[in-house]
Design a protein with these regions (language model features):
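Bacterial N-terminal signal peptides
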Residues: 14-24
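Flexible loop/hinge segments that line or gate small-molecule binding clefts
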Residues: 110-145, 265-277
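Short beta-strand elements at the ligand-binding edges of bilobed clamshell
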Residues: 79, 132-156, 172-176, 276-295
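Hydrophobic alpha-helical segments within soluble ligand-binding/sensing domains
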Residues: 139-168, 184, 214-215, 264-270, ...
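Hydrophobic alpha-helical
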Residues: 101-120, 189, 203-272
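Hinge/cleft segment of the Venus flytrap/periplasmic-binding protein
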Residues: 13, 33-35, 173, 193, ...
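Extracytoplasmic "Venus flytrap"
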Residues: 34-68, 76-88, 106-109, 138, ...
Length: 340
């Protein structure tokens, strides 16, 4: 049998390589390496809000479920129930299941340390949300940074709309809720206001998480400042809306500007809901709210997890890119078709 010439052999090899490349490019998702990622949520309890905002655990869980769709990830979900023993048990269950990576969202240093030790012993990498797990990269809210965004927005509004007029500022909401790091938010607000409006007197009013306290507390403050313009930094969106009602009830809407924190559904609305921050409502005294994006947490965390699984380096700490959402940009951040 006559052997093919070198030129023919080289041509055949080139065709074979090209075919392999084409087949590789066309591999269906089912043929790619898939990773099993466990996500242990802080809580799934209905009506319980997270991190001093209006977001709930089911919203966070849904963000992970939706974000995982385009990735080669099989998601395993756990509920830590805000309970240390449950958090440890969930980690043990994930280890028994031999997951490839564990995402831990739990408030509790001791429990997180225990979970971290168990995962390390099992050779499973971890990624922490908001509260550290020893040795794991952390994705966290930047409460102080979010507060600064709110304070700067209020100061800019005052400089633009009330230049030369006597102005006071008040931070209202669950200002002492240390477990949710709200005091960091308050410090960010007051720091920015002191830098930008050094002549404005600052006051904090603590509702202790009770929206019914907004009207009497803010009403008394407004009565004590009858001829001044009032900047109102609310620690969450529900408080911002309650503050708006309180201000309008006493006829002081022309003297006030409000910024909230969170950008949850109570303020930007679903497709069939009333929307306080909306291009059609540009004259609202709620001039904006600082986005926390907890309803999109999965979209931020899962790409980090995938990089870790592929052996890529990730930052030891990644912070939420908080942004002021106003009537001018709300449809960019939350398009109408995405308000479901």
């Amino acid at each position: 049998m006559r052997l093919p010439t070198p030129a023919i052999r080289r041509g055949a090899l080139a065709i074979l390589v090209a075919a392999v490349i084409v087949v590789g490019i066309g591999l269906p998702a089912s043929a790619q390496r898939r990773w099993v990622v466990a996500f242990a949520n802080l809580t799934e309890e209905p009506g319980v809000t997270l991190e001093g905002t209006g977001f709930t655990g089911p919203e966070v869980r849904e963000s992970f479920t939706l974000a995982a769709r385009p990735y080669p990830i099989d998601l395993v979900l756990y509920d830590n129930r805000r309970d240390d023993a449950r958090a440890a048990a969930n980690a043990e269950a994930a280890i028994a299941r031999r997951v490839d990576l564990y995402v831990q969202y739990h408030h509790g240093g001791t429990a997180n340390a225990t979970v971290g030790q168990k995962l390390k012993a099992a050779g499973i990498p971890a990624l922490a949300i908001n509260d550290p797990v020893p040795g794991a990269p952390l994705y966290a809210l930047d409460n102080a940074g979010a507060g600064r965004v709110a304070g700067e927005a209020l100061a800019q509004f005052a400089a633009r709309a009330w230049s030369g007029q006597s102005t006071v500022a008040v931070v209202i909401g669950r200002v002492s809720a240390a477990a949710e790091r709200v005091p960091e938010r308050v410090r960010g607000v007051t720091g920015a206001l002191r830098e930008r409006l050094p002549g404005a007197r600052l006051t904090t009013l603590d509702t202790h998480g009770n929206p019914a306290q907004v009207a009497p507390l803010l009403g008394a403050f407004l009565s004590a400042n009858p001829s001044r313009k009032v900047l109102i930094a609310a620690t969450d969106d529900a408080t911002a809306l309650a503050a708006k009602t309180a201000v309008e009830t006493v006829g002081r809407a022309l003297d006030a500007a409000i910024v909230g924190q969170g950008v949850d559904r109570t303020i930007h609305g679903g497709i069939n809901d009333r929307k306080e921050i909306d291009p059609a409502n540009r004259n609202s005294i709620v001039i904006g709210s600082v986005a926390f994006y907890l309803d999109r947490l999965g979209y931020e965390v899962l790409p980090l997890a995938l990089r870790m699984l592929r052996g890529e380096a990730v930052p030891s700490r990644t912070l939420t890119p908080h942004k002021l959402i106003t009537a001018a940009n709300v449809f960019i951040e939350y398009p109408p078709y995405d308000m479901n």
